Amino acid sequence: MAHVLILHGFTSHPILTLGPLPEVLRRAGYSVSQPTLPGHGTRPEDLVGVRWEDWYRVALEAYRSLPEPRALVTLSMGALLGAKLAAEEGTSAFVAMVPALGFVNPLAPLAPYLRWVVPTFKGTNAVRDPQRKKNNPNYPYFPTSAFVEVLKLRRQIPPLLPRITAPALVLQAQHDSTIPQAAVRRYYELLGSSSKEYKVYDSEHDLLLDAKADEVAQDVNAWLKRVLPPTQSP
């Protein structure tokens, strides 16, 4: 059986923001693991004092616990952690949804300095569909100090991407108000994979919460089944 590790994003609810994807993959026959990264799934204040190394430690432990063959399916900040895992641990298939290699907010690069005077940032309700927007489970705000850790992690990723050679799928949101489209494209172009695909959806940043969530989940499942069938053995 093939195993899939799903990594959620920064401020994301570890279960709810993954939408239909985990269940779609399970029904297809994959073994699915979806760890909760430290500081998530509770309240924004629990991100205070959490370092990027803490997120990576949890992701690494969860990944190493999975038998091969194994795939990485990642979202936003999770695509930074996933890239580090894929480059350093290897993987059979790699999916990166709206990877957080840059940020639309012009204040984002200033977070290391702003944290002393601006303790929190407002979260982005990155869902276009009005009804789904009302039920967004992500944190409404987050500690600036925690975002600084995201920036520290992000700086490490560009040199790692050429080391990833597994089949890769990168998904972009056409109306993303969080991650610039150019940053997602750069992530894709830096990947060392000889077999890689790039898809764009009529969606906001939260691909698995917005109106295209079902389509995204089905597309990820179909792609995985091509490159790593659920019944594949080591």
Name these PLM-found stretches.
Residues 203-214:
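Catalytic histidine-centered segment of alpha/beta-hydrolase-like enzymes
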Residues 166, 180-189:
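Short alpha-helix in the alpha/beta-hydrolase fold that links the catalytic acid
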Residues 164, 170-172, 176:
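Short beta-strand/loop motif that positions the catalytic acidic residue
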Residues 74-82:
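Gly/Ala-rich beta-loop-alpha elbow adjacent to hydrolase catalytic centers
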Residues 95-105:
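Active-site nucleophile loop of the alpha/beta-hydrolase fold
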Residues 175-179, 206:
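Acidic catalytic loop of the alpha/beta-hydrolase fold
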Residues 143-160:
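Active-site nucleophile elbow and catalytic-triad environment of alpha/beta-hydrolase enzymes
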Residues 1-43:
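Short, surface-exposed "cap/lid" segments of acyl-processing enzymes
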